[in-house]
Amino acid sequence: AVLYLPKVFDLPYGELLGLSSLGLVLFGLAALPAGWLGDRWSQIGMMVIFFIGVGVGSIIVGMAGGPDGLFIGLTLIGLFASIYHPVGIAWIVAWADKQGMTLGINGVFGNAGSAIAPVFVGLMIDFVTWRAAFIVPGALSILFGIGLLVVWKAGWIRDVTTDRTPTGAPDSSAFVRVFIVLTVTMACTGFVYTGLTNTMPKLMEMGLSAALAASYTEIGIFVGVISGLASFSSIFGGWMADRYSARSIYIVFWALQIPILFFVVSLSDVPLLVALLLVLSFMLAFAAAENMLVAQYTPFRWRALAYGAKFVLALSIGGLTVHLAGWLFDRNGDFAALFTMFGAAAIIAADAAFMLPGGRPKPVEAVGAD
């Protein structure tokens, strides 16, 4: 949509992209209170608010008559979307027998949305109207929230109060070290991942020839296919996270990204598509290990709050990255400087990962989730 709406509202690409900046910042900042409420009130109740709130924001965007309406709707989407990661991930981890694989499968479904969205938006723009691209999913989100509320009140689903498969307590001397490393790596993740996913459609518009992509639908299909294929690396990463240390996983997959990030903007056509697929796959591969680290080094009663703190850092930086990307593009006409920064961030993250503990806590006797 960000490729098409500048023509509708007569705005520069960077300025339109900037309308989502506050929403992306809130996507991160509001994760902390959302996580706290998930720990103190209800995981399911917060997810009901998530679905209904995101749906309302999306419909507002679809009905917008100008930049102000877009800004309000996108900001509401970011605010309510902040609930999912701290509350939803904590809920999933608590129910999981194999946390790594479960997180990996969840990642596939999460990224399936990212894969389908650009295709759906492209189809709506080319064959219906851009407004349908927001109003239709917004209405579905509200209906899903109402459905979740009904099954919750009927007692078919419940909140979780303990891990199904708890792990032994890790060495307390490693707490500070893990916290410092995660602060660095998650900041780098927010910077690179958000910047990559938000600039990928524009990179394709600039780098793909008309023979490959001549319409918004075709660009959307390429973005969707790459996101969809890359999402399967989440399963591989989850499988690895159940067997190997987060330290090894972090180092390998951050290091693999470094050369690609420095050179991707100089590529075009098929080499560009392959490079984007690889770098996105490498980023998604270590997500399960990162989330397991947070779970292993955090008491259950603070679990959602800890995930909230993680996403405050990563997603708030991501929101600023979108603003930076738009500003650099409007000034320079390309993303060369931005991706040089991404490559530098990958080097920093890979180096920081060497400080992580080499092992991982062992599972203790499993207990049922209440």
Regions found by a protein language model. Give the residues of each.
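Conserved MFS/SLC helix-loop-helix module at the cytosolic interface between two early adjacent transmembrane helices
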Residues: 29-66
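Residue-level signature of mid-helix packing/kink "hotspots" within the transmembrane helices
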Residues: 24-32, 114-115, 227-235, 318-319
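Extracytoplasmic gate region of multi-pass secondary transporters
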Residues: 2, 177-233
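Interfacial helix-cap and linker-helix signal at transmembrane-aqueous boundaries
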Residues: 5-6, 37-38, 120-128, 204-205, ...
